[in-house]
Amino acid sequence: MEEIKVSVVIPVYNVEEFLNNTLSDITGQTLKEIEIICVDDGSTDTSCKIIEEWQKRDSRIQLIKQKNQYAGVARNNGLKQAHGKYVVFWDADDLFERNALEVMYTQAEQERSDICICEARKYDNAKEKYIPSDAYLKENLLPEKQTFNKFDVPDYIFNLTNNVPWNKFYFKK
């Protein structure tokens, strides 16, 4: 069995309309040494059936079922099953660049980082396009170098990003 470089944990709750796109996006990542852990949080729609169909096509996909306990518990249960060196928590309606995992993995390995944070864009339904959002990563506060620590930005290290888990790439071991 190949080494699992990244575990992708996805909390799932009644997201049938998004799941096919999200699973297609993740299975199509350029980094192939991944596992995809879908944690169903008591869905009442066809979310589990969609995941089970994907499992037939891709052995990297796992399904964990739990009663409804909300996304935090689902993420924690997925984390308990994760075997990757790194872990990301993506929501079922998230889409990422095809090379997102590979870029973050390579950067984390080169810099021996404990966490990588990526920018995000959100879809503006009225304008029918993606727009930048500094709510997830305040690029104007970042130091010029890509890799930094709390000593580089001591006054606002905790203000650089908000508390969403899906734009972060974590060292697990």
Residue ranges and their predicted role:
Residues 1-173:
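Nucleotide-sugar donor-binding/catalytic module of glycosyltransferases
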